[in-house]
Amino acid sequence: MKDDHQNKQHQSNAQGSEEAFSHKTSGKNESEDTLTNRQGHPVTDNQNVRTVGNRGPTTLENYDFLEKISHFDRERIPERVVHARGAGAHGYFEAYGSFGDEPISTYTRAKLFQEKGKKTPAFVRFSTVNHGKHSPETLRDPRGFAVKLYTEDGNWDLVGNNLKIFFIRDPLKFPDLVHAFQPDPVTNIQDGERIFDFISQSPEATHMITFLFSPWGIPANYRQMQGSGVHAYKWVNEEGKAVLVKYHFEPKQGIRNLTQKEAEEIQGKNFNHATQDLYDAIENGDYPEWEVYAQIMSDDEHPELDFDPLDPTKLWYKDDFPWKPIGKLVLNKNPENYHAEVEQASFGTGVLVDGLDFSDDKLLQGRTFAYSDTQRYRVGANYLQLPINSPKKHVATNQEGGQMQYRVDRAEGQNPHVNYEPSIMGGLKEAKQDGKDHTPHVEGDVKREAIDRTNNFGQAGETYRRFTEFERNELITNLVNTLSTCRKEIQDQMIENFTKADPDYGKRVAEGLKKVSENNSNGPIGTTETEQAAKQAEQESHPSDPY
């Protein structure tokens, strides 16, 4: 009886406190648009600091100024180590309730897919990868395509890219990959020789480089580019049976890409063009849409294939594993505040709901730790309490404390004295399991070893042959322009790799390099004219007298 009375008293007190803090009042001579400081104090003079006389020294008790400037000093959180430059929008995913002509429940019990016409709120963040927060959106770079779906079972994050494959398959190489693509730690200049030094010694990257240096490496904007989950995931049905699955987002606006020359011309006019394009389209009611497709494959090793189906450097070809529609993604609302929503939006490949699961893709499993870890560093331990990241459903947890906690995620009626589980004193209880667990059988020796079926060049050659002649020409031009800045050993290794992919591919790169005089310019990706540009700025600039 004592415990019941105590719990009711705490609930009453908590309710009273919440009501008191949620009720906002305005003081005398205040209206809704009255400027205040963060303490709620009205600001009567926002133009002048407090001084001894109007020309005298400032006083230390300038609280409004000290609060204002101190907050300004801390306005920026650490930018993302990759995908720093981004844009985002709100919208929804609408399910078709089927996988092609079959009920989707045959393959997955995830609730958001089951009912035709069911809409799930979504937030999508697009990005470039290797450059800083305010870098141009015209650079040759993969584009991030990260989707957060606020489902009835909690959040699901699908953290993908526009290109359907990746450079590497082992997460141990990821920091080195990023270091190679990002600026030189001494000069702070992106260096094509550093990039191809790494790529030439990582033959599994040949396929991705083939896409990146073609027009597919510079999407025209975010609305007219594809999205992909890149990795093989799993769908799990009510019986606990699983299939491998890949996700694809195809823009209903069509797909458009840029050549290097076109991108440079656009960059000279507006280096925020993709962000502006997305924002303006939504403001004008021209809501971008993507048809969402899935491919499935039985959850086994597939020895009949010449590649490992879990290898993220490989495509699953449509002819073998058809794309089937499962829904559509629509973006219909711009963010109200960029920092609060787009910058603080936090995604993780480990954020899955019931009916979805991981595959044994090594890179996927490495990302699953890295993404959530970087959000805790970048945004804080309580990043999931921010509105953009918080699920749109009941949350109750015994996690507490940490930097910037501003609420306790407690269940209604929970005994506030019990912040652990199990308990018989009014604490939280475990949920009931929906469907059967998926229990894959795994056995083997623990070792450091690459997968058996690497086939690093087969699909790179197939992609080269499937390109149009225009795409092949642009690919060769861009590769030659950057490789011409590299030492001969790197050029020779890349020619060897391209030749293994397709003899014509290697031959054309070799012929192109013969026509370009070798130089040691540390040029950025896709151009050999960077040193000339630096000299041009000095030679063609206009002198001015000091003042």
UniProtKB/Swiss-Prot annotation:
It comes from the Bacteria. It catalyses: 2 H2O2 = O2 + 2 H2O. The active site is at H83, N161. Disulfide bonds: none annotated. Heme binds at Y371. The keyword Metal-binding applies. It is an enzyme of class 1 (oxidoreductase). Residues 527-536 have a biased composition (Low complexity). It holds the Pfam family Catalase. GO terms for cellular component: cytoplasm. It is found in: Cytoplasm. Residues 34-59 have a biased composition (Polar residues). Belongs to the catalase family. This is Catalase X.
